[in-house]
Amino acid sequence: MSKLDEKKQLKCSFCGKTQDQVRRLIAGPGVYICDECIELCSEIINDEFEDDIQVDLTSLPKPTEIKTYLDQYVIGQEDAKKSLSVAVYNHYKRINSNTNNDDVELQKSNILLLGPTGSGKTLLAQTLAKFLNVPFAIADATTLTEAGYVGEDVENILLKLIQNADYDIEKAEKGIVYIDEIDKIARKSENPSITRDVSGEGVQQALLKILEGTVAAVPPQGGRKHPHQEFIQINTTNILFICGGAFDGVDKIIERRTRTSSLGFGAEIQSKKEKDLGKLLKDIMPGDLLKFGLIPEFIGRLPIVVTLDKLDREALIKILTEPKNALVKQYKKLFELDDVELEFNQEALKEIADEAINRNTGARGLRAIIEDMMREIMFDIPSQENIGKVIVNEDCIKTKKPELIEAEGGKRLPIKPKKGKKRKDSETA
């Protein structure tokens, strides 16, 4: 073959094979690809699609299995975990049932979570979605306003879910949406007002169709809708909505309804223990939510009401030490990476829990307390090669000075790895 023929002979731009060595060569603008490379690329793409998160609802875990998983991350709240496990199981069982073309069509049951700040409402919803391997989105009800006013449209909630599902609409339509601070969209008074309540009752009205199940038009870039843009169509019929809120003040409404109206010497005296918020919330009725400011139609679309208890000292100590992502375990690991052993004594844990109770922040405030307490020592430790152990005692919350113990020989040694995990050895003295 002449050199001129070699130049004229076409080759695949990817594997370099000539047109004589392959069955077909497809031309593009200044580039060629053979049938073998096309087949290889197709296999790679198919493998990637198979590796994507699949929403497998055929092998749905039982309520006991769901609760067992929740127990690993959420301390206490036994009644809430059982109620949520059953509700989620029934929701996805309903999706499977409605695809079988039965005579009976099961309706959706969204969930309302009531509990004090820091009691675990958001964590429960997040953990459920993680276990079920379904797309999950968190929305803040305080940013929502009625259509036509400054703020977010309710459809933006669905956009977050679609984005978390990598724009796979079919996957997103079986996801979970958690709407936080739902109590903040309660209408301002029980009586209808002549002025529009655009961030209260107006938002409740806008959420009704989405909660019930509708084909919603979602702007792909978020923000307000305008007539000259394309929309993403998503059916919300099989999306599970969990709405959570602290509902500050609803306890007084429940008290007024439940207490016996008696005066004088025969009046019943309630102790502070009897007025525990978590116990009061268990007696909540739809009428109490109505008086709080939720409209009847909105209450009707959240038929499952789950209440959470206020966390006491014992529960907060368990939260600090027991879950897989416990704060004490996290800080111990951070110190271990600097070859320093960290120890919290029991009295210190009690003080941290009491401080969280005093601040009325629940479990959410634990990290802030520990971070404030450990800031100085975490700043100094990497530079102090002679420190081998740090002990946090009950005085550390006030003094912010843990007890420091020098390493043997004046210089710390690498902490021995646990369970066979390899660590890089640092220089020793």
Swiss-Prot record:
Description of how the protein assembles with itself and partners: Component of the ClpX-ClpP complex. Forms a hexameric ring that, in the presence of ATP, binds to fourteen ClpP subunits assembled into a disk-like structure with a central cavity, resembling the structure of eukaryotic proteasomes.
Function: ATP-dependent specificity component of the Clp protease. It directs the protease to specific substrates. Can perform chaperone functions in the absence of ClpP.
Binding-site positions, Zn(2+): 12, 15, 34, 37
Annotated stretches, region: Disordered: 408-429
Keywords assigned by UniProt, alphabetized: ATP-binding, Chaperone, Metal-binding, Nucleotide-binding, Zinc
Biological-process GO terms, alphabetical: cell division; proteolysis involved in protein catabolic process
Binding, ATP: 116-123
Keyword Chaperone (UniProt): yes
This protein's GO CC annotations: HslUV protease complex
Signal sequence, start to end: none
GO molecular function, one term: zinc ion binding
InterPro entries: AAA+_ATPase (IPR003593), ATP-dep_Clp_protease_ClpX (IPR050052), ATPase_AAA_core (IPR003959), Clp_ATPase_C (IPR019489), Clp_protease_ATP-bd_su_ClpX (IPR004487), ClpX_bact (IPR046425), P-loop_NTPase (IPR027417), Znf_CppX_C4 (IPR010603)
Disulphide bridges, residue numbers: none
Matches recorded under Pfam families: AAA_2, ClpB_D2-small, zf-C4_ClpX
Tagged with keyword Oxidoreductase: no
Species: Clostridium botulinum (strain Hall / ATCC 3502 / NCTC 13319 / Type A)
Basic residues bias locations: 413-423
Gene name tied to this protein: clpX
Domain ClpX-type ZB: 1-53
Protein name: ATP-dependent Clp protease ATP-binding subunit ClpX
